[in-house]
Amino acid sequence: MEEAELVKGRLQAITDKRKIQEEISQKRLKIEEEKLKHQHLKKKALREKWLLDGIGSGKEHEEMRKQNQQDQHQTQVLEQSILRLEKEIQDLEKAELQISANEEAILKKLKSIEKTTEDIIRSVKVEKEENPEESIEDIYANIPDLPSSYIPSRLRKERNEGPDDEQNRKALYAMEIKVEKDLKTGESVVLSSIPLPSDDFKSTGIKVYEDRQKSVYAVSSNQNTTYNGTDGLAPVEVEDLLRQASERNSKSPTEYHEPVYANPFCRPVTPQRERVISPGPNFQERIMMKTNGLGNHANESAHNMTDGLSERRSNGPTHTSPTRPTPQPRSMVQQVEEMVHTQQKRMASPWEESSNRQNEHEVSPRMELSPSRASPGKSGPQCSSPTCQEETEDVRYNIVHSLPSDVDDTEPVTMIFMGYQQADDNEEEKKLLTGYDGVIHAELVVIDDEAEDNEGQTERPSYHPVAPYNQVYQPPKPTPLPRKRAEVRPYENTNHKSPHKNSISLKEQEERLGSPARHSPLDVPVAGDGTEDPSLTALRIRMAKLGKKVI
């Protein structure tokens, strides 16, 4: 009771102290307001007094004098109110100090009487020891809404505990692991792991490990538990065995293969019969234009494709030419073709043809040389069979096989110039590329540049460095007509003396470019005045304007 009274007195002291503090704060705010009013009235009285000195006697003077007296009286009242409030604040502060002193005294008494946490725990233990007959059931019996079937967890645990508790615990999960131990190295390898129902598991064998979470029993293969060489397992060994068993169970039966890269030139795999195209000059005569850069590129592609197709068409064994190692893309797969001695037509799928074309285009011209054209310095098997001789036929017929099989030979072909490629002009290359002249003939050559479309609309005379040909008049660029051109016979001179473009002699052009002319049996016949084809001359002039060098 004394402790409760002390606590009550302390709470009352705290409440009174709080009220006094609030009252003190209110009085201080009121004092501030009174001081502001007092200052204002004092200034007003001084101003009115100064005005009275300058005004003579009269009614107005009397009114101002009365107002000044009222202001002075109000100022005195405010001064007295301020002094009174300050005195009250001092009294309240003294009362607050007194209450604080009483609160401290009550707190000291309360600390001397109040029990600590340790004392409370100690007293509870003493009470429990004094009343041992009181059980948990008596405590829960006082709860009104508790069902009669409820049994506290502590009481259930006490009832379930017994002398053989460690042996009577039921296994939640069991697994049979067959382990093979190497007696030389001491390593254990898990051969198989079979999960077992926990109900069917019986603690048979010798216990070799137990950590209150899992138990390991060693059983021999013949179910004999008394055998020699059984020792306890270390925790590391048990964890290793469990890890191997779990890895063995979690292995996926999925078989993985090497990465497969898609072929960007793949077509539907519907088999089609290969069209047999007899090599001849019919189609080439229609698409030949003499330009070293474009002819070189087109002839290289045609030569590469012809070698691959001639190997497929040949009846003899396949010959591999000596090549220099060059980096190939990862997606390119080396293909080994096996030729079969047969006279029947071979069926080929379109995707195989496109894949072969891709490989043939990406290989450099030096790698596509046949053994019969290889230089003497390079080592490799020499080929003198008729099959190899067929491969070394005139390259002007090979471009036919590089085109798709669905292209009609009678329709014109549009060839777009994509640019030049730097190439070393050495004599060894010329010898290896015997039979290549870099010439393509065409019925109609249209050279167009979007940047100079406006310039081609106006007619202007062009200047030629050679005096006899400097008065050639250049009309507007001809527009190709959508009509079929007449067939041109082989080696027919297609040069017609017409003032379409400037003409320049071959000798002078070669002197300007600084490279000797390549004479070939397929050169375009030169006109009687020593000039070459106007279309070729226009192409050379156009390339010179663009800053490109015609090789």
Curated annotation (Swiss-Prot):
The keyword Cytoplasm applies. Phosphorylated. Signal peptide: none annotated. It is found in: Cytoplasm; Cell projection, Dendrite; Cell projection, Dendritic spine. It comes from the Eukaryota. Residues 247-266, 294-390, 451-533 are annotated as: Disordered. Ubiquitous. Expressed at highest levels in the heart and lung. Its main location: cytoplasm. The modification Phosphoserine is found at residues 135, 321, 349, 370, 375, 384-385, 498, 515, 520. There is a cross-link at residues 125, 178 (Glycyl lysine isopeptide (Lys-Gly) (interchain with G-Cter in SUMO2)). Keywords: Acetylation, Cell projection, Coiled coil, Cytoplasm, Isopeptide bond, Phosphoprotein, Synapse, Ubl conjugation. InterPro entries: Paralemmin. Residues 341-353 have a biased composition (Polar residues). The modification N-acetylmethionine is found at residue 1. GO terms for biological process: regulation of cell shape. Residues 247-258, 354-365 have a biased composition (Basic and acidic residues). The modification Phosphothreonine is found at residue 270. Residues 12-106 form a coiled coil. There is a cross-link at residue 178 (Glycyl lysine isopeptide (Lys-Gly) (interchain with G-Cter in SUMO1)). One of its GO terms (cellular component) is cytoplasm. Belongs to the paralemmin family. Interacts with GLUL. This is Palmdelphin.
